Amino acid sequence: KRVLEYYEGRDVRFTMDTLSAHFLEEIPDGFRMIIEYKKSPIGYAQAYQLSGELFDEYDYPDDGHIVFAMDQFIGEPKYWSKGIGSSFLKMMASHLKDNMAAERVLLDPHQDNKRAIRAYEKAGFKIIKSLPKHEMFEGEKVDCWLMELAL
């Protein structure tokens, strides 16, 4: 329930079929993964290369750089505020740079998700602009920050 405060919203009902369809579907030019800590699954992440209309969706210039966007969450509250999220983001940024030639990584957290924003800043991400009414959440469009990490 706590994760749904920022991911999809509390008004979205998931079943095993909808979860499987969403989280196991292949992503073009990207990948999905379960985040583990000490061999226990604690979260989820996905990364995908921006192309075409995704640059427009993020209002981000398509200037020839290889740019990836990421979505992630740690779903177990007992693992929050322990540095695990920022460590994971640093590891993912290194993986994207070293294995996929990424030059930039983008995140788009809800502006009121202060805990996540602190973790992202701790990992080196910078807020570069506001994305007003960027994401549908609990029946209305909410404001997000566009955050960037140059690799």
PLM region spans:
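Conserved acetyl-CoA-binding loop of GNAT-fold acetyltransferases
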Residues: 121-131
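Conserved acetyl-CoA-binding loop-helix of GNAT-fold acetyltransferases
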Residues: 75, 81-95, 117-122
